[in-house]
Amino acid sequence: MGLGTVHPDSDTLKEDVESIISLGLRGVKLHPDFQRFKIDDYRCLKIYELCEGRLPVLLHCGDHRFDFSNPNRLRPILEIFTGLDVIGAHFGGWSVWQEAEDMLSEFSNFSVDTSSSLYALSPEKAKEIIRRFGASRVMFATDYPMWSIREELARIDSISLTADEREAILYKNAAKRFGFSL
């Protein structure tokens, strides 16, 4: 299972998204910090429009060092594109956790993944977020693996989840969201 990427400056965005679909990829990954655009940049509106109701969008979110990917920038996007399925990488806001929680609280079409975040987010805080917003809104490692799977699984296990929560986070949520069978 993979995701494709596009850039808002492309002159062929519609064709780019159609290529992602025709290749059998299951969503679009955007990294505002590396690709040098803000989540709410007007140039991204066409991407969100093309993906709404068709492809989940995995967004690099957070990092207090940059303003491109602050989860607060999602607010107008999630208000406009209510059918857009947005996954905030790094628990929705690496190093700006409260902003991610605000988005989870306000928008049912926003969920998070665990990649490259559980080393910095305490197991207690991760568990609090999972219990507050539901395990159905958390997915394991849909983004780039900074650490080994073994290390990431150990971090998941340190959260003391129920068996149902663990299964949902590790694979059931991704299977449902990205449309593959178990």
Label every model-predicted segment:
Residues 15-19, 23, 135-139, 150-182:
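Mid-to-C-terminal alpha-helical segments outside catalytic/metal-binding sites
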Residues 7-10, 63-64, 93, 145-146:
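Short glycine-enriched loops at secondary-structure junctions
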Residues 20, 28, 51, 90, ...:
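Conserved, mostly hydrophobic/aromatic
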Residues 26-27, 37-139:
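Catalytic pocket-lining loop regions of alpha/beta-barrel enzymes
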Residues 1-46, 110-111, 150, 177:
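Mid-domain alpha/beta scaffold segments of enzyme catalytic cores
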Residues 34, 116, 144:
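Flexible, active-site-proximal loop/turn residues at the rims of small-molecule/cofactor binding pockets
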Residues 33, 63, 169:
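Residue-level "edge-of-site" marker
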